[in-house]
C-alpha cells in the first residue's frame, strides 16, 4: 500500500459507475423461473427463461438490456465461454451522485450475452445486489477511474467457474496498469479505526465502512480475474486490484487473480473475511497487504513479482499507519503460500518476502519466500515485542514451518542464503541500520521448534517465467520424506483446508491449480 496524500486535488476527476446502460429508457428485461410469478414494473415485458427467480424493485431503471433481479444462480451454460464479438452495454448506476460517481439503488444482473463497459465509479447501495454471470467481461472505461464499490449492506455475487470465469479488465486498445480502478468491497465487520474511509477514494459518507458484525456477508467473488487496474488518483494514491474494508467472514472469496495492477493486488483493511486460492501477478506494489485490525484467514496464495523498481513486498503488514495499540490488533492466520520475488540490480529499492511492522500480529505457516532482496524484516520496537511473544496480552507474531531462500542481502551480491550469513545475519533478512539490527531475524527464524528451512534450495527459478511459470518444487521435496512435508505444520482449523500439511501453495509437483483453467492468465512481460 502506498500511503495517501492529496485527496482534495482529485475530487473533480473521479468517476465511478455501476449500472447497465447507454440510454435512459424505462424498459426492464426480467428473467423468470418456470412456475414463478415475477413482480414487475408496469409496462415491462418479462422474458421467461427457466432457471432464475427475480425480484424487481418498483420503478427500477436499467439501460442497455441489463437484467434486474435477485442474486440467484446464473443459468447453466456451455463448458467454456463462447468466443466472438458481443454487443457492448454501458454499466452505470441509476442515480447520479455527481463528480463522475453514480449509485445503483436496485439489484441488477450483468449477463454474458454482452460485454459491459464500466463508466466511472459505481456504488452498490445497501440492500442491493450486483450479480455478474459466468463468462461476463467488464471493461473499465479509461479516463473515468472506473471502479465498483460495494457498500456496507450491499452484495456482489460474481461467481464464475474455472473454465467460465468473470473478467474485469481495461477497455483500452493497448492495456496498461492503472487504466481503470478495481473492485472495492466494504462491509460491517470490526476495524480498529473510528468511522474510517477506504483508501483510493475521496473522504465522504459513501466510503465509510466497518462495524460489529464479524460474520457479515458481502456476497461472493469466485473464479474471477482483475487486470490492469490501480488507477492513479494522485501522488501515492492508487486503487488496489481488489480492496476489502471491514468485510465479514460469511463473504466467499476464492480463485481470484489480480494481474498487472499499479498498486497492491489484494489489501485487507480490518475485517474478518477469509480467502483462498488467490494469485497476484506482476503488481507495482505489494502482493498481500493488511492493516486496521485484519483478522481473517488466508490460504493458498501465490505471488509472482514483475520487473519494477519499487518497494514491492510479498506481505506488507501493519496494525495501523503509526503502530498504535488500537484494537482489534491485526492478526491474520495464513498458510500455504508461495512468494516468488524478483531480485533487482544493486541500488534498487528493497523488496521483502515479508515486511511485518507497525505493531501487527500474525500466525504464518507453510510459506515459501524465494528470490527477494530480503526474506523477512520484522521492523520497529513494538513489532519486535510481538515476535518475541513479550507484547503483553498478545497477539504475537509467529512464522514457522516456512522456507526462505535466494536473497540478495545487504551486500548486494545476490548471495544465496545462508552462504556467509551466519557471520552477517543481515544477508537475506533485515536491513543494516542499527535500529533494524536490534532484532535478528536469522536467529529468530532458526529456533528449532519453529521448523523453518533456511538452507535448502526449492529450485523455483521457473516461478519467475511470466508466460509459463512453474511454482512447484522437485518431486523429491514432497512425499512422506520430503522436506516440504516433514517440516510442514498442520494448518489451523479455522483455515479452509486443514489437511494441507505441506509448505508452499502446492500439494506436490503435479499440483497446478494456479496455472490451470481459464480463470488465470499468464502472458509475456508487459502483455
Which residues does each predicted region cover?
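Sec-dependent bacterial lipoprotein signal peptides
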Residues: 1-18
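Short, intrinsically disordered low-complexity segments
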Residues: 1-2, 25, 53, 506
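Ser/Thr-rich, Pro/Gly/Ala-heavy low-complexity intrinsically disordered linkers and tails
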Residues: 20-80
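Beta-strand/loop edge motif enriched in small/polar residues
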Residues: 21-26, 76-527
Amino acid at each position: 500500500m502506498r500511503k495517501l496524500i492529496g485527496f482534495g486535488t482529485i475530487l473533480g476527476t473521479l468517476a465511478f459507475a455501476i449500472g447497465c446502460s447507454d440510454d435512459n429508457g424505462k424498459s426492464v428485461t426480467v428473467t423468470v423461473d418456470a412456475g414463478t410469478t415475477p413482480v414487475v414494473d408496469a409496462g415491462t415485458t418479462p422474458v421467461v427463461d427457466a432457471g432464475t427467480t427475480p425480484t424487481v424493485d418498483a420503478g427500477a431503471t436499467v439501460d442497455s438490456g441489463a437484467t434486474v433481479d435477485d442474486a440467484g444462480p446464473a443459468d447453466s451454460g456451455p463448458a467454456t465461454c463462447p468466443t466472438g464479438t458481443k454487443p457492448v452495454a454501458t454499466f452505470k448506476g441509476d442515480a447520479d451522485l455527481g463528480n463522475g460517481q453514480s449509485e445503483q439503488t436496485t439489484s441488477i444482473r450483468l449477463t454474458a450475452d454482452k460485454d459491459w463497459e464500466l463508466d466511472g465509479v459505481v456504488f452498490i447501495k445497501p440492500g442491493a445486489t450486483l450479480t455478474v454471470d459466468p463468462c461476463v467481461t467488464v471493461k473499465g472505461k479509461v479516463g473515468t477511474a472506473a471502479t465498483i464499490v460495494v457498500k456496507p449492506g450491499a452484495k456482489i455475487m460474481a461467481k464464475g467457474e474455472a473454465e467460465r470465469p468473470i473478467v474485469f479488465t481495461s477497455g483500452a486498445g493497448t492495456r496498461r496498469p492503472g487504466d481503470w480502478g478495481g473492485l472495492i468491497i466494504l462491509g460491517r465487520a470490526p476495524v480498529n479505526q473510528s468511522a474510517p474511509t477506504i483508501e483510493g477514494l475521496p473522504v465522504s459518507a459513501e466510503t465509510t465502512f466497518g462495524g460489529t458484525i464479524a460474520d457479515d456477508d458481502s456476497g461472493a467473488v469466485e473464479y474471477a480475474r482483475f487486470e490492469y487496474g490501480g488507477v492513479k488518483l494522485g501522488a501515492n494514491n492508487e486503487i488496489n486490484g481488489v480492496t476489502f474494508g471491514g468485510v465479514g467472514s460469511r463473504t466467499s472469496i476464492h480463485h481470484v487473480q489480480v494481474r498487472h495492477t499499479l498498486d497492491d493486488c489484494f489489501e485487507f483493511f480490518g475485517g474478518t473475511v477469509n480467502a483462498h486460492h488467490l494469485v497476484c501477478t506482476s503488481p507495482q506494489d505489494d502482493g498481500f497487504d493488511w492493516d486496521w485490525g485484519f483478522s481473517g484467514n488466508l490460504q493458498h496464495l501465490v505471488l509472482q513479482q514483475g520487473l519494477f523498481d519499487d518497494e514491492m513486498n510479498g506481505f506488507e503488514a501493519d496494525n495501523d499507519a503509526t503502530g498504535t495499540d488500537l484494537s482489534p490488533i491485526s492478526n491474520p492466520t495464513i498458510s500455504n503460500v508461495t512468494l516468488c520475488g524478483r531480485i533487482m540490480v544493486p541500488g534498487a529499492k528493497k523488496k521483502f518476502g515479508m515486511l511485518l511492522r507497525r505493531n501487527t500480529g500474525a500466525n504464518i505457516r507453510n510459506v515459501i519466500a524465494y528470490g527477494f532482496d530480503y526474506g523477512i524484516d520484522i521492523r520497529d520496537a513494538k513489532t519486535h515485542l510481538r515476535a518475541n511473544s513479550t507484547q503483553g496480552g498478545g497477539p504475537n507474531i509467529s512464522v514457522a514451518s516456512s522456507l526462505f531462500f535466494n536473497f540478495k542481502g545487504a551486500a548486494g551480491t545476490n548471495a544465496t542464503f545462508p552462504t556467509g550469513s551466519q557471520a552477517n545475519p543481515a544477508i537475506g533478512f533485515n536491513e543494516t541500520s542499527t535500529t533494524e539490527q536490534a532484532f535478528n531475524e536469522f536467529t529468530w527464524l532458526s529456533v528449532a521448534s519453529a521448523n523453518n528451512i533456511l538452507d535448502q534450495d526449492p529450485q523455483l527459478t521457473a516461478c519467475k517465467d511470466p508466460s509459463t511459470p512453474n511454482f512447484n518444487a522437485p518431486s523429491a521435496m514432497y512425499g512422506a520424506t520430503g522436506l516440504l512435508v516433514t517440516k510442514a505444520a498442520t494448518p489451523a482449523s479455522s483455515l479452509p483446508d486443514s489437511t494441507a500439511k505441506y509448505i508452499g501453495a502446492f500439494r506436490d509437483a503435479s499440483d497446478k491449480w494456479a496455472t490451470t483453467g481459464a480463470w488465470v492468465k499468464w502472458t509475456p512481460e508487459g502483455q
